[in-house]
């Protein structure tokens, strides 16, 4: 199979294009495929807070593969062994949570790349990523098609942001609003003026360094604000929250005293 590996999500980030995404926390390929038919530019398949196994992630990658929406996998953490598994099942774009230092960023970057550029384990002949050995020259071309995003979501990470941005192999930095606001002393309050100020300056610093800047904002006005600050990959909802809100709104039409939607600034 003489196939050229491409990553449309990464290519659009390189061009500075804005990409609108959706968070998938439902853990099912059925819901993932429904989301893929909606036309979002990218879909974050969450393995950090949603109870996704490697097989769950694999099945969701299969479900969205026929569609234009680009999958982004967030594993529960950035260990070398877990990154190897996620890449082998076919993920091309990773979002690694809780990256606090440049050393962590370098370790993550190394784990995504084959030698001599990194230390990813070699197993293309048994991996979906290489179509079980049928993609010719897979190891020679895969590094260029991988997109590595890291999450900055603590005060420590903010203090080290410039050093993280300098790490080779990091394509973008995602600001995690929920954990960041808690780390700054404002738990469950990403809308606090001080948190908002830090989010704005961080997004601008990321873009000034030539990297992509990402954010999750379930409130439309917050999403628009982040786009105005320069964020260029923004998730504007979470599937489980949208589903529960839709259920609540429908029930409220027929039963008095029921609550309406609960959309907030963070999840």
Swiss-Prot record:
Site feature: Increases basicity of active site His: 88
Highest taxon, organism lineage = Bacteria
Task: State the Gene Ontology terms under molecular function.
Answer: 2-keto-3-deoxy-L-rhamnonate aldolase activity; magnesium ion binding
| Enzyme class per UniProt | lyase
Q: How the cofactor binds, per note?
A: Binds 1 Mg(2+) ion per subunit.
Gene Ontology cellular-component terms for this entry are: cytoplasm
Q: Which reaction does it catalyse?
A: 2-dehydro-3-deoxy-L-rhamnonate = (S)-lactaldehyde + pyruvate
Q: Does the keyword Metal-binding apply?
A: yes
Cite the active-site annotation.
Answer: 49
Question: Which UniProt keyword terms apply here?
Answer: Lyase, Magnesium, Metal-binding
The record's listing under Pfam families reads: HpcH_HpaI
Chain sites annotated for binding Mg(2+) = 153, 179
InterPro entries membership: Aldolase/citrate-lyase_domain, HpcH-HpaI_aldolase, KDR_aldolase, Pyrv/PenolPyrv_kinase-like_dom, Pyrv_kinase-like_dom_sf
Enzyme Commission number(s): 4.1.2.53
**Site residues, Transition state stabilizer:** 74
Family, similarity comment:
Belongs to the HpcH/HpaI aldolase family. KDR aldolase subfamily.
Extract the PANTHER family matched here: 2-KETO-3-DEOXY-L-RHAMNONATE ALDOLASE
The entry's function note states: Catalyzes the reversible retro-aldol cleavage of 2-keto-3-deoxy-L-rhamnonate (KDR) to pyruvate and lactaldehyde.
Q: What is this protein called?
A: 2-keto-3-deoxy-L-rhamnonate aldolase
């Amino acid at each position: 199979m003489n196939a050229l590996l491409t990553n449309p999500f990464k290519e659009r980030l390189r061009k500075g294009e804005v990409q609108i995404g959706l968070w998938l926390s439902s853990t099912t390929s059925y819901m993932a495929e429904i989301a893929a038919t909606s036309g979002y530019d990218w879909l974050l398949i969450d393995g950090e807070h949603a109870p996704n196994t490697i097989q769950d992630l694999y099945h969701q990658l299969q479900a969205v593969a026929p569609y234009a929406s680009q999958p982004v996998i967030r594993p529960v953490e950035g260990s070398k062994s877990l990154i190897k598994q996620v890449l082998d099942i076919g993920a091309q774009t990773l979002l690694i949570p809780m990256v606090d230092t440049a050393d962590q960023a370098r370790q993550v970057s190394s784990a995504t790349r084959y030698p001599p550029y990194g230390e990813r384990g070699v197993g293309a002949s048994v991996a979906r990523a290489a179509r079980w050995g049928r993609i010719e020259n897979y190891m020679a071309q895969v590094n260029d098609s991988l997109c590595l995003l890291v999450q900055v979501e603590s005060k420590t990470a903010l203090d080290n942001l410039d050093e993280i941005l300098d790490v080779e192999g990091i394509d973008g930095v995602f600001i995690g609003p929920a954990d960041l606001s808690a780390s700054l002393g404002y738990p469950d309050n990403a809308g606090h003026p001080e948190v908002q100020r830090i989010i704005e300056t961080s997004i601008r610093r990321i873009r000034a360094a030539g990297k992509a800047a990402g954010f999750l904002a379930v409130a439309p006005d917050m999403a628009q604000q982040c786009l105005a600050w320069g964020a260029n990959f923004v998730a504007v909802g979470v599937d489980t929250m949208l589903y529960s809100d839709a259920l609540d709104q429908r029930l409220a039409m027929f039963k008095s005293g029921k609550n309406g939607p609960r959309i907030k600034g963070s999840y």
